[in-house]
Structures are given as C-alpha cells and as structure tokens.
C-alpha cells in the first residue's frame, strides 16, 4: 500500500495556515500550498473556482468574515488512492464542522450573533508536494435549519449536528493497517456496485443487509437528516425517494 504521510502533513499544514490567515494573507497562503492551476469544486453558491485569488475571495473570505472567530473541528481525517483515477491520484479527506459566531450576513442569510456549526467535507488531491485539485461540500441546508429558517419541508430523518465516530478514532494521522484499509475499500465498492446495479434480493431492505449492520447510522445532510438502523434508513431516507 502507499505511504501517504507526506500528503497528509501538507494538507494539515494548509488547514492550519488557512485557519490562522486573515483577509490580507489568504491569497499568499493558498498560493504557497497549491499549484498554479489549482481548482476547487464547491457547494452552491461557490460552485467552481480556479486559482488562489478566486478561491480566497469567493470561498474563504466570505466564510471567515461571516463566522468570526472561526475554528475547524475535524471528526474525520484520512488519505487514500483514487481507484477511479487509475489508482494513481493521492487524495486527503477531512470532515467535521466549521464553528464560529455568526456575525455578518452570509449570502443574504442574516446573522443571529450566536455560535453556529457549518458541516463540511473536503477532498484534496496532492501531486509533487502541491495541492492541485479540491472539493468542498458545505451543508447549507442544515445551517439554515439551525437558524430555524423554513426553506424546505420537514426532514424525514433526525435534524442534528452530526457527531464524530462513536469510538472517536476518525482522525487517521498515522499510517493505518493496510489489510483493514483494503477490506473497507472493497466493502464500499461492493455496496456502491450493488446500489447501482441492483441485486436479486426480494426487497431493498434485504439488499442493504448484505453490506450493512442492522445498527447502521446514516448521517444524512440537511433536508434529509439522520436515520438509525436499516429500518430507520428505509423509512427516513429511501422510502421518501421511492414515493417521490
């Protein structure tokens, strides 16, 4: 298996530098860690961004201006090889919440001057000790639900701030066991292929039991919400889609 410690170190340094940067230094910080053709795919309204200046001005400065002070609270951190990129692309992933005091308007959403958590998931590709590509997903719907804004119908699952793993071991700073990592990857691929291609099982619930424990927890985004157990997932997540 690949040793991705250097890639993880680079991305952690990038996170820390972004966290400590101000509006005047963000472009310089992003340029230091990224390639000249660095691009980001982001949640709307940020969408696709290219280059340090555009990413600083259109992504991080609006976030840091609206939520101040702000801190990154990571629950998940790991690295891996992208199997969809000829098993060559080295990616580092992080998930958690950006916590801050909501002090200034955020794309038309008015502040409540209270602490708030913005759920995120980030993915960064590293090549030649530079970040060349990234994606960030921000749970804007859950953020609006925390504010009590009735912009969408009631969620079919639990509306909450997503906790980290129950064993609190989601931060993989050190090298992970290769055999366990491979087993996990194979399970995810098996589940993905079954969901896309279907199986010969009589029901969707029976199909899920092939890959999931009964006490599986689905931490869905705002608008869907979280579901506990396979029965809960079918009721709170799958059935509404099938009914629609």
Please tell me what each predicted stretch does:
Residues 1-244:
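C-terminal and inter-domain tail/linker signature
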């Amino acid at each position: 298996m690949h040793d991705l410690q250097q890639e993880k170190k680079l991305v952690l340094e990038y996170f820390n530098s972004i966290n400590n940067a101000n509006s005047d230094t963000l472009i310089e910080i992003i340029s230091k860690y990224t390639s000249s053709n660095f691009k980001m795919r982001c949640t709307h309204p940020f969408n696709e961004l290219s280059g340090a200046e555009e990413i600083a001005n259109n992504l991080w400065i609006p976030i840091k201006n609206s939520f101040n002070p702000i801190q990154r609270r990571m629950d998940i951190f790991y690295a891996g090889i992208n199997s969809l990129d000829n098993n060559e692309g080295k990616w580092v992933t992080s998930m958690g919440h950006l916590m801050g005091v909501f002090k200034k308007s955020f794309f038309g959403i008015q502040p409540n001057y209270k602490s708030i958590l913005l759920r995120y998931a980030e993915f960064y590709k590293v090549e030649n000790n530079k970040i060349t590509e990234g994606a960030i997903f921000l749970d804007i719907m859950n953020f609006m639900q925390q504010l009590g804004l009735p912009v969408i119908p009631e969620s079919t699952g639990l509306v909450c701030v997503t906790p980290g793993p129950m064993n609190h071991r989601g931060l993989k700073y050190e090298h992970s066991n290769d055999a366990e990592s491979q087993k996990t990857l194979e399970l995810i691929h098996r589940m993905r292929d079954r969901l896309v291609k279907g199986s010969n099982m009589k029901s969707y619930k029976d199909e899920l039991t092939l890959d999931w424990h009964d006490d599986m927890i689905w931490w869905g985004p705002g608008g869907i919400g979280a579901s506990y157990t396979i029965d809960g997932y079918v009721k709170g997540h799958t059935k509404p889609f099938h009914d629609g």
